[in-house]
Every structure is written in structure tokens, then in C-alpha cells.
A protein has these predicted regions:
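Acidic, metal/ion-coordinating pockets
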Residues: 1-300
């Protein structure tokens, strides 16, 4: 929810208002489940619990406990039913702020293994949300092998969707930390007893190669592409290569029963916005600017 694990002096009010606004509007878009991580507790435990009460927002954590009573602070998992497919989701974080004295962080590896063992028999697809950097969790990936998907936050680098995920291991996706993209994962299951194959690279190939062919065709839409470039053997060789690539990609897509694909959607100005929401967000940003000006004056 926050850009950092601490609140910048003088900008506390605007940071909290931004976080509240994000939670408010995402809650109106559907069911969102958030793994509680170090950058969600920036404004303290009460702040995040109040957001959960005020909006239809769902926070998950399997390893954050109340120091006093040793009870979980958030729902530790959820099982969703999507067209007869049971999807289990749970989340863990490696660490939180050192000054969060009322929160106990249990070992995320131990708790993740416990949740995987508990949920695996109950679900068709098991999703693990992990708030940690790759250098901390990489050596433990084999211990999470019974999960189907691992989505990580806190890592600077993002997953390259064009690199195919290996069959037989959890599909691992690093979402980055800057909030400039939304990661989207689509899953199509036809046979629960067969493995899932990542077809992101094939989908990208078919799409990009088709676009390149269309671009070549634009020179003269009324002619066959072979006639347009009959005197350009190098271009014709490229056309043949693009067609074979599309054919190969479509063959995989058509013959894969259980498909999974992942892509990043850039949050640029080209993304269509709901006008009413955009209007409200602009108001909030204007308010944040004023709050920052006021806060910085008070701290100077």
C-alpha cells in the first residue's frame, strides 16, 4: 500500500490518504486478496485493520501473530470456487518493521510449509503469496514445491513472461515493487489430473508475429503479401519465418489442455480509466499535494 516501509516526515497524511484511496477503489472492482507485507504495515497495524473494516478488502497472512494472545492477526488463507475449480490462496512475509512491538512474525518458511501441507489435499490449485526478496527465498523454493504458483513482492526485478515456466515446479512470478504494472495470470483447466503448462511465450509469439505480418501487409492491403515483396527475398524469408512461428505457437496452444499465461499490463496514460473514479482520484491527488505542503511547513 505504501512506497516504503516508513512514512516520510511531513508526508504521513498524504501517504495514508493515497493508501486508503487505492484500497477503496480496488474493493469496488471485485474480490482482491492482499498478502500483508512490510510495506503494508508502514502506518501501523490499526491503520490496515481499519481499512479492512471500512472496505471490502481482504488481507491474508499465515505468519503474523498477536504478541499478547498468539492469535493470527489476519485470515490465514482463502479457498475460492471458480467454475468447479478450488483455488487456495495464502500469504507469508519474511519480516516486518522492527518497531512493530505488538506483532510477532513466525518463520515464514515453516509456516508456508505448514499451510501447503494443510491446503494441498483441499484444492486443485494452490497459490502462495510471498513478501520477500529473491536472495532470501531462493534457497527455500524446493520446500515450497507442492504449491502451484508463487507470486512474490519486494523484489526489484520482474518476471519476464516470455521465459517459459518449467513444468513440474511452482510457477514463480516476481511482481516488482514500483506499482507501474499490474501482473495478470489467466488459467484454463480442462483436466484436473493433467499438469498445467505455461503458454505465455507462445501467446506472445503468436501476437507479436501476427502484428509484424499485418505491418508488412499494410504496404498494399489489396495484394497478397508474396506479390508485394516478390522482389525482396529477405522480406519473403521473414514472412515465412513469422508464419511458421505462428503455426508452431498455435499448435501448442491448441493441444495444451491445461493452460496458464502471465503478462504485465503497464499502468500508463494509454490505459482506459473509469471517468468517475479518475475524477475522484484527481481530487485526492490535489488534496495530497496540499497535505504535503502543510506537513512540510510544520516539520521545517
Amino acid at each position: 500500500m505504501f512506497e516504503s516501509y516508513y512514512l516520510e516526515k511531513g508526508k504521513e497524511a498524504s501517504a495514508m490518504l493515497r493508501a486508503q484511496t487505492v484500497m477503496k477503489y480496488t474493493s469496488e472492482m471485485g474480490d482482491y486478496y492482499y498478502n500483508v507485507g512490510v510495506q503494508d504495515l508502514t502506518a501501523g497495524l490499526d491503520f490496515i485493520q481499519d481499512i479492512e473494516k471500512d472496505h471490502s478488502v481482504y488481507f491474508l497472512s499465515s505468519n503474523l501473530y498477536d504478541v499478547d494472545n498468539n492469535e493470527l492477526l489476519f485470515k490465514d488463507h482463502v479457498i475460492l470456487d471458480r467454475n468447479g475449480l478450488k483455488v487456495g490462496i495464502f500469504g507469508v512475509t519474511r519480516e516486518i518493521q522492527l518497531d512493530a512491538k505488538n506483532i510477532k512474525t513466525k518463520d515464514y518458511v515453516v509456516e508456508a510449509k505448514r499451510k501447503i501441507e494443510e491446503l494441498r489435499p483441499q484444492v486443485d490449485i494452490l497459490v502462495m503469496l510471498l513478501n520477500a526478496t529473491q536472495r532470501h527465498y531462493q534457497s527455500h523454493l524446493n520446500e515450497f514445491s507442492d504449491a502451484d504458483y508463487i507470486f512474490t513482492s519486494l523484489e526489484d526485478a520482474k518476471t519476464r513472461p516470455e521465459v517459459e515456466q518449467p513444468i513440474g515446479k511452482p510457477f514463480e512470478y516476481k511482481l516488482g515493487i514500483q506499482g507501474k504494472n499490474i501482473g495478470r495470470c489467466d488459467i484454463n483447466i480442462a483436466d484436473k489430473n493433467k499438469p498445467i503448462r505455461d503458454v505465455s511465450s507462445q501467446m506472445m509469439m503468436a501476437d507479436i508475429f501476427s502484428q509484424r505480418l499485418s505491418k508488412l501487409q499494410e504496404k498494399d492491403p489489396k495484394k497478397k503479401i508474396e506479390d508485394i515483396y516478390k522482389n525482396s527475398p529477405n522480406v519473403l524469408a521473414t514472412v515465412e519465418r513469422l508464419r511458421k512461428g505462428i503455426e508452431s505457437a498455435n499448435s501448442v496452444l491448441n493441444n495444451t489442455k491445461n493452460r496458464s499465461s502471465f503478462t504485465f499490463i503497464p499502468l500508463s496514460r494509454s490505459v482506459a480509466s473509469e471517468k468517475n473514479i479518475l475524477k475522484e482520484v484527481d481530487k485526492v491527488l490535489d488534496t495530497c499535494k496540499k497535505l504535503d505542503e502543510k506537513g512540510l511547513k510544520l516539520t521545517s
